Regions:
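Flexible phosphate-sensing "switch/lid" loops adjacent to ATP/NTP-binding sites
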Residues: 1-372
């Protein structure tokens, strides 16, 4: 069995973290009762959180350590961060690529010695970090890591992107062990699996996973929207991890000729002064609850007049999460546009979806290549 592996992807939001979740869960199950240890590392991180003692680490390292109970130290799991302004500092000579690589090398050495298998997760596509002479392929070559690459489900454009990423790996002498397709159209699974596998044969690289798209994994939560819009929940805080199957910008009046249809799992965006819309949402939620159902609605309000305490209490009583965004931050149209373009990462506190992602990956991937 190989002892360490780098998880790459052809781009951002393709599925590195999702795949890593499934891989960690698979290996933890395999190691259970054996005394073997599993380790995780994000050699180069970008989004980061404070973990105490003045230390900040990559969000993914935080998620993996806390969710899976990994025992290694944070400083090794996230040795290098690229915060805002870091690239300029590098070009100004405040830090060198040798210093950065030394930090990664020490962290890898520690984790490798402390574990029976080490999963390293890359950042973005294979070339990310090149401006600091620290891209994923260079890191893999330095640490003598083989790689597995995640690509988006599809054929032509997906394979084109894979080819570019593979070329960078080849230039650095990194072996690509396998390819995993993510977010594949369920209706095209068999066709894509067949043709992609045949296309990969020219490189003698196996397709080791074909993961169908699961919308529940990519839908942002109310907590994600609150962070995106730099606002806070004014109600329904216990439903902060609620996510939605549709979004509605409510502009038309609600009256006898224009009823506000009750749609489950819908996020509504409207003006804070639209009492007719807000009352209709609350009324629909209460009517559904009398029949033992929960519409699981969500609400984003904008406008110069913040929602009253009374309204927040009414929304809270029906557990409807609501965010108020003042117009100096964004109007209804801007909010709708931001939401439609937003892709959220799985949150550490969203245990249900972490487990869902791990199980989904494990079900559709064959990790037996690790035993070679």
């Amino acid at each position: 069995m190989i002892k360490h592996l780098l998880v790459l992807s052809t781009g951002q939001h393709v599925g590195k973290t999702t795949l890593s979740l499934g891989l960690v869960k698979t290996l933890q199950s395999k190691f259970q009762g054996s005394g073997k240890q599993l380790a995780y590392c994000k050699p180069v991180g970008q989004q980061h959180v404070a973990v105490g003692g003045g230390l900040r680490v990559d969000k993914d390292a935080f998620l993996f350590k806390e969710h899976f109970g990994l025992v290694q130290e944070y400083k090794d799991m996230s040795p290098v961060l690229f915060p805002d302004g870091f690239t300029r500092d590098f070009i100004d000579g405040k830090v060198t690529s040798q210093q950065l690589m030394d930090s990664i090398r020490v962290a890898h050495r520690n984790l490798y010695a402390q574990s029976d298998f080490l999963i390293c997760e890359g950042t973005g596509h294979t070339g990310v970090g090149s401006i600091c002479e620290l891209n994923n392929a260079q890191v893999a070559a330095e640490l003598k890591l083989d790689a597995v690459c995640v690509a988006l489900g599809g054929l032509g454009s997906s394979f084109d992107q894979l080819a570019m990423n593979r070329e960078m790996l080849k230039q650095n002498g990194v072996r690509l062990r396998g390819v995993i397709l993510n977010k594949v159209n369920p209706k095209k699974m068999d066709m894509i699996k067949d043709y992609y596998s045949r296309a990969l044969k020219r490189w003698d690289i196996p397709l080791v996973g074909c993961i169908p798209d699961l919308k529940d994994l990519s839908c942002p939560t109310m907590a994600d929207y609150a962070k995106l819009l730099k606002s806070k929940l004014i109600s329904g805080k216990s439903a902060s991890l609620r996510y939605f199957s549709s979004t509605r910008l409510a502009l038309a009046p609600v009256d006898g000729n224009n009823l506000f249809k009750a749609i489950p799992n819908q996020l509504v965006i409207t003006h804070s002064g639209r009492k007719d819309v807000i009352d209709a949402i609350i009324g629909n939620e209460e009517a559904s609850s009398t029949h033992g159902r929960n519409l699981k609605s969500g609400l984003i309000l904008t406008g110069w007049n913040p929602p009253s305490t009374e309204l927040a209490q009414r929304l809270d009583a029906d557990n409807i999460p609501c965010i108020y965004v003042s117009p100096d931050k964004a109007d209804s149209y801007t909010i709708t546009a931001r939401i439609s373009q937003f892709t959220a990462k799985i949150r550490r506190d969203d245990v249900e979806r972490i487990d869902l992602a791990a199980d989904h990956v494990s079900k559709h991937c064959d990790f037996s290549f690790l035993d070679e």
